[in-house]
Amino acid sequence: MRYREVIRAPLWLLAIIYFFMLTLVISIWSALGDNAGLIALAAVSAAIVWLYIATSLTIEVNDKELRVGKAHIQLGFIGQCVDLDAQAIRQARTRDADPQAFLAIRFWATKGVKIAINDTRDQTPYWLISSNRGAELIKAVKN
């Protein structure tokens, strides 16, 4: 394994979501009683843990391929790679986005990488990936 990075939801975001879900728990508790409130609290807590796991994005580079989530591509089909700062990735995922591009982005990640795809059988022009360590990812892909 040459490179591995996991992008996870920040704790402040999970805390806000949990707070809003707790208002639902309080409503259930006040309307239906203690047992229903405890069940709702357990369900909400489990939902937050599931959300934390489900929204994580795993980026891996080994000797043969690049894996981003469930998608993967052989390193031989990777073209030019560009490390994007906050402003550049904001433009790349909005105004300058190509509808055929593969997007593996998380709104809470402020940096990323744009990887061109050189495969004549694939209509995907590039992959846009959220990454906090873009330079390291590019180095791992190119070596």
Where are these regions (language model features)?
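Short, solvent-exposed secondary-structure boundary motifs
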Residues: 40-41, 47-51, 94-96, 105
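C-terminal/domain-terminus segments
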Residues: 122-143
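Non-transmembrane, membrane-adjacent beta-strand/coil modules in membrane-associated proteins
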Residues: 69-128
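Conserved beta-hairpin
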Residues: 43-82
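Short, aromatic-rich membrane-interface segments at the entry and exit
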Residues: 32-41
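N-terminal membrane-targeting/pre-transmembrane regions
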Residues: 1-31
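Pocket-edge structural micro-motifs
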Residues: 5-7, 117, 131
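Lipid-exposed faces of alpha-helical membrane segments in multi-pass integral membrane proteins
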Residues: 16-21, 40-47, 109
